[in-house]
Design a protein with these regions (language model features):
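Active-site region of glycoside hydrolase catalytic domains
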Residues: 1-199
Length: 199
């Protein structure tokens, strides 16, 4: 199913696995590709999990898991999917990328690592035209309520008071400079200095 929608809107072709047919009106019907990328998950077949399309989540024992077991933090996956989407021939916007991080301890490194992967893709002529972090402020999630904190800006649900987080300050600097530089990484994610800027 991974390529089914993109194949349909680019080529007007619905794959055999979901009922092969051609739909000419769909062919080349998009102006850009919007990518929402959050994490990596492994699944295994489970014949008892009908409601989950017979799949069961399997955790990577070596992976970094985000708050509330939201998924494995895997920045390289962003690069890999951007390279794959390059074949669409369309401009690409990363329309959502983020993780729940109640205390904003990991979000600065998450941002740095994902922006680095986006930069690698751009340097390989992947037409990435924009990046939107998920989210600007903490928001109410349908299944989780206020329990997952995704925002660059902390939101108190009772008072509606907003406070800029460290990750928000980092992202503001990145946007203003249209770059991620050594000073930003040193101040916001110093543990990544040697891996982000090698040599």
């Amino acid at each position: 199913m991974n390529q089914s929608v993109i194949d349909a809107v680019l080529r007007g072709r619905i794959p055999r696995k979901i009922g092969a047919r051609r739909v000419r009106a769909l062919r080349d019907s998009i102006d850009f590709v919007g990518l929402n990328y959050y994490n990596r998950e492994f699944v295994a077949f489970d014949r008892h999990a009908r409601q989950a399309f017979f799949g069961r989540r399997v955790q990577n024992p070596d992976g970094e898991i985000s708050d509330k077991n939201y998924g494995e933090v895997y920045p390289r996956g962003l690069y890999r999917i951007l390279r794959r989407l390059k074949r669409s021939g369309k401009p690409i916007y990363i329309t959502e990328n983020g993780l729940p991080d109640h205390d904003d301890d990991r979000r600065p490194a998450f941002l740095v690592n994902h922006l680095k992967q986006m930069w690698h893709a751009i340097n390989e002529n992947v037409p990435v035209m924009g990046y939107y972090h998920w989210t600007l402020t903490d928001n109410y999630e349908w299944a989780e309520g206020w329990n997952l904190r995704f925002g660059l800006v902390e939101l108190d649900p009772k008072t509606q008071r907003r406070s800029l987080r460290r990750s928000g300050a980092l992202y503001a600097e990145v946007c203003k400079a249209n770059a991620l530089d050594t000073d930003m990484v040193r101040r916001y994610a110093p543990e990544l200095m040697e891996t982000v800027f090698r040599g």
